[in-house]
Amino acid sequence: MNITFIGSGYVGLVSGIIMGYLGHNVTCLDNDEVKISKLNKQILPIYEAKLDEYLKQALESDRLKFTNIYNNELQNADAIFITVGTPSKGLGEADLKYVYDAIDKVFEHINKDCLIVIKSTVPPGSCSNIIAYLKSRGFSFNVASNPEFLREGSAVEDFLYPDRIVIGVNNKESEAILRKIYAPLQGVKFVVTDLVTSELIKYASNSFLATKIAFINEMADLCEKIGGNIKDLSKGVGLDQRIGQNFLNAGPGFGGSCFPKDILALNNLVENHHIDCRILKAVIKSNKQRPSNMVDKIATLLDGDLKGKNIAILGLTYKAGTDDVRASPAIAIVKILLNKDVYVKAFDPIGLENAKKNLEHKNLLYLDSAVDACKSVDIIVIATEWSEFKELNWQEIYDLVKSPIIIDFRNILDNETMKKIGFRYYAVGSKI
């Protein structure tokens, strides 16, 4: 089928590239000329495991192209996916400016049978509003909702082997087109529902996962006070099939481009409908406070005095497997430390350049290796769960630090191994 993606950000790129790999004829449109030029040279603007391989295959098979020109080629599209950003504004309300900008640019070029698919995360009711908007301008297109559930760091696998595909439609024709598009993914479960429910599923899913993270983080705080083991607790709870083990790793809080934004948007939605959803408010508050709580733990290990201390931060992305630093707890921790006159030496294996764009400070030094970041520091903070941190020569690092203290906010190192080397080692959920 002929498919066009409007917006070549994270979702549009991954979806478009894999759709091309699966055999569809795909055009990815974006206003950023520099990005488009690089993509046509097989240079990705994001880090995502294996995506470069699929990009190469799709381009070489001539089933994928990138452009910034909205032209009559759109007339051949069977479906147009809107995959632009929907950032938060004000008190968490989703800003749909880019969605409507995309609609405005394409509706005069596409044929009457083309299906407009909203893959961007939008509040319930948005698709119906878009249909009304198009009708007010004399156009009558089918509009469907098809939210994405891609996890950064494993997005390729998530697209090829999804748990489910959610489709929100108001007629059988739209459903048939989407089923045909996803036909190469055999054995996939489809959830076919109305437009509003489809839109709400995305918000509810992300908010529920965020709730699991906030809950296990608070259980880690309890373990710290009473001497429990948070890893064993997470395992014991997660092996219950009703709960599941995913998103039960205690840490410095959730971040990224989805969870913080989506739970705020859902909270905004329920408040607009005069529903007092206390769970959402509690999760938002808990996660907002989490980086400050982590800094308090660092201060405790340094006898309450942070001013002038040298601290190594290992990991800057909001999680491993991505270069994304948006709403990263690690970045939030660094900012708090800098405000307390701390000298920070930071390293991340993938996200260093994005971190530099996000945060600069006279007391912040970005290093090209974890070992260099740890030289002569008062404490080492592991803020992101990169596997390479487990493989470091910690004996070498022990000989380089000023004070052999590690606080592991991701619980990735082995307590006994670190202590045998000579480190004072603390993990999330352990007594300080």
From Swiss-Prot:
A GO molecular-function annotation: NAD binding
Annotated pathway, please? Nucleotide-sugar biosynthesis; UDP-alpha-D-glucuronate biosynthesis; UDP-alpha-D-glucuronate from UDP-alpha-D-glucose: step 1/1
| Active site positions, chain numbering | C258 (nucleophile)
* Lineage top rank: taxon: Bacteria
The protein's matches in Gene3D superfamilies, at most eight in alphabetical order, are given as: Cytochrome c1, transmembrane anchor, C-terminal, NAD(P)-binding Rossmann-like Domain
One of its GO biological process terms is: UDP-glucuronate biosynthetic process
What InterPro entries is this protein classified in? 6-PGluconate_DH-like_C_sf, NAD(P)-bd_dom_sf, UDP-Glc/GDP-Man, UDP-Glc/GDP-Man_DH_C, UDP-Glc/GDP-Man_DH_C_sf, UDP-Glc/GDP-Man_DH_dimer, UDP-Glc/GDP-Man_DH_N, UDPglc_DH_bac
Q: Which reaction does it catalyse?
A: UDP-alpha-D-glucose + 2 NAD(+) + H2O = UDP-alpha-D-glucuronate + 2 NADH + 3 H(+)
Q: What is its EC number?
A: 1.1.1.22
Q: Which Pfam families match?
A: UDPG_MGDP_dh (PF00984), UDPG_MGDP_dh_C (PF03720), UDPG_MGDP_dh_N (PF03721)
- Binding residues for NAD(+): 2-19, 30, 35, 121, 152, 261, 326
Keyword tags? NAD, Oxidoreductase
Q: Which family does it belong to?
A: Belongs to the UDP-glucose/GDP-mannose dehydrogenase family.
* Protein's UniProt name: UDP-glucose 6-dehydrogenase
